[in-house]
Amino acid sequence: MVNIVEKQNRLSLISLSLVSIRYKSWDFLYRILHGSIFDYIIGPRKELLLYFKCVYDSTFFNGKNYFSNLFTDTATSFRLLTFLNEHDLKSIPPLPLDKCQGLDSYSTLYDGYIVQSSHESQGLYDGSGKDGNDYTMKMQIMKNVLEMQINEMDDEIKRIKLRRNVVAKKLDVIISRIVDHKENKSKTDGSTEDEVHIGNTSSVLKQTNHEHTIITSENNTDDKVSLLTLEPDNAQIGNKLQRYFEAMKLKKKSSGFDIEDFENIIGTKGQLGKTLKCHDDYINSLAINAQLGVLSSTANLDNEIKLWDISTTQCLGVLSGHRATVNTTRFIDDTRLLASAGKDASVKVWDVDNIVDKDGNANDNLCLATFDGHKDSVTALATTGNAIVSGSNDKTLRHWDLGSGKCIQSIDLTIALKMVPQSVSKLDITPSFNTPLIGGADCIDNALVTGTKDGIVYLWDLRIGRVVGSLEGHRGPITSLKYMGSELITGSMDKSTRIWDLRMGSVAELLSFEKEVVSVEESQTQLINALEGEPVKIYDRGERQYNSLPDSFNTTTLVVYESLLALGNDHGDITWWSL
């Protein structure tokens, strides 16, 4: 009888427990297993109830339910303890009840391993644990976690790009405000169309807290714009240069510049004249002041500028002061002043008129001023009125006023060119060893033209320091540029010379060659093209014909005045021609 009762009690408890588990009547089952009746049960019934008590505890307190309380939900607790998001929680495969309990759940480590806290099922990541399903589960969790991390990285990249776009828009607004401020300041100060007066913008720049400036103030004393350094006394900078500038205004000689006076060196038309041995390396710059009858020349690896008397072909003197190769020279309009720029990142102004003193001796103290503002090699110069514009590999253009001896504008190309509304975003403004960033520059009044290594021509308004137009067509670096009012001539390493109609913004004529164009000049209706390793080609625009100058191979630069042509070659020689 007792055995029958025990069996009935056992079956009743089993049925009751199963029903409770099936319908999740945890409170009712808890009272049975943890109540006083449990203490009176002995024998096999006790063992059975212990089993169900274990099942109950593992079910009620496993995983998500273990950390449930009045302050949080199970999903949040489980996510925090396992470092998984809601999506990954839903994708976790089912586990045995003796797995995934409380702090025994899995978590990722930075070294790529998965560690389980339970001592009963501790295994290695290589699948050598006791349970094959355990290993599969580990791999699945690891896969989900890594995918989650990748998604988070992608989201972070999107947020960074979005923030960058916002900052770029703010930058454009700040630049526009700076330009508007300068325009309003100029109008308030009563500046005319032909003058450039840049007010103090340092307060505006400080308010914006921005590191880059497109136009810097002439009163700015930090390293971004280094003011002109005069030799030998900086304190006399403005007065000395102003005095020389006013005194150097040229009045034409009564005799003028007559080509016939130089027939002895030029020879007959189209024939080679006299050849001068001037330098030891290839000549990189020539400049003529016809009213003085002086030619200047510079060469590679030569820190000096040599001045030549055109009528006698004698060397008048040497200008020393640069600390590295002189890249380019230019006579300042209507003055006896010569501007030079070199790889030492400096721009110098020289008094050429006093190359010889009253006693006929060479004068060594001819450098009037040194502009030390650039941080890299200066490769292009343009002069207009009483100003000089210099272009450098440091990605800036600087506008120097000879009247005051100060830098009145500093234009950062990395910022200014981003404001051009066209396909210039592809522009690579990184200078290379052999190709300068700015290959040519020319200026008329406040209109500046520059040519870059990517073959793009930019038109600038110096009054506001901004690009007002661009010309695209060249497929190689621009090496030479000549601005002639309504027309512009450019030579390029893409083996072409282009004549641009600036009124239409298009190419008027295109000249193609078999070699790279290294220098271009214009004389009346003729275009003189110096080509890499070939004779000089002369194009007659009226007759549309090409002619070659004999014995003009390896020309590296050239300069022309009326029918006088001077060629510099890679041997350091200068040859004269009559066109």
Curated annotation (Swiss-Prot):
Q: Where in the cell is it found?
A: Mitochondrion outer membrane
The record, for Pfam families, names:
WD40
Top-level taxon of the source organism = Eukaryota
- State any GO CC term: transferase complex
WD repeat feature ranges: 278-320, 321-360, 373-412, 419-472, 473-510, 512-539, 540-578
InterPro entries per record = G-protein_beta_WD-40_rep (IPR020472), WD40/YVTN_repeat-like_dom_sf (IPR015943), WD40_repeat_CS (IPR019775), WD40_repeat_dom_sf (IPR036322), WD40_rpt (IPR001680)
Q: Name the UniProt key words of this record, in alphabetical order.
A: Coiled coil, Membrane, Mitochondrion, Mitochondrion outer membrane, Repeat, WD repeat
List the membrane topology term(s): Peripheral membrane protein
Q: Which residues form a coiled coil?
A: 137-167
Role this protein plays? Involved in mitochondrial fission. Has a partially redundant function to MDV1 in acting as an adapter protein required to form mitochondrial fission complexes. Formation of these complexes is required to promote constriction and fission of the mitochondrial compartment at a late step in mitochondrial division.
Similarity field: Belongs to the WD repeat MDV1/CAF4 family.
Protein name listed in UniProt:
CCR4-associated factor 4 homolog
Please name the source species: Candida glabrata (strain ATCC 2001 / BCRC 20586 / JCM 3761 / NBRC 0622 / NRRL Y-65 / CBS 138)
Lineage summary? Eukaryota, Fungi, Dikarya, Ascomycota, Saccharomycotina
